[in-house]
UniProtKB/Swiss-Prot annotation:
HAMAP family: Ribosomal_bL28 (MF_00373). One of its GO terms (cellular component) is cytosolic large ribosomal subunit. The keyword Ribonucleoprotein applies. Pfam families: Ribosomal_L28. NCBIfam families: L28. This is Large ribosomal subunit protein bL28. Keywords: Ribonucleoprotein, Ribosomal protein. One of its GO terms (molecular function) is structural constituent of ribosome. Belongs to the bacterial ribosomal protein bL28 family. Coiled coil: none annotated.
Length: 97
């Protein structure tokens, strides 16, 4: 399981710990990943995703998983999230027609 958010693509970053004496040692900055279950209102199902706390706030802000995925860019999404986005778009197109 990779340490990357499935919705925003946030992953591990690298940098330095810097002491008061300006000594530098390499370190990793890990994303704050949470295992959450989000409900798709369009599909009527719940999906278990591993997303960052920041992504969870963004999903809530945009009004749910469906709205977040419709507005998000495909290159940031994981393969599973892209599949989910296509399913939602297809279902919404059927409902509109």
């Amino acid at each position: 399981m990779s340490r990357a958010c499935e919705l925003t693509g946030k992953s591990v970053q690298y940098g330095n710990n810097v002491s008061h004496a300006n000594n530098r040692t390499r370190r990793r900055f890990l994303p704050n990943l949470c295992n959450v279950t989000l409900i798709s209102e369009t599909l009527g199902q719940s999906y278990r995703l591993r997303i960052s706390a920041n992504a969870l706030r963004s999903v809530e802000h945009r009004g749910g998983l469906d709205a977040f995925l419709v507005k998000s860019d495909d290159k940031e999404l994981s393969q599973r999230a892209r599949l989910l986005k296509r399913q939602i778009a297809k279902k919404q197109a059927e409902a509109a027609a």
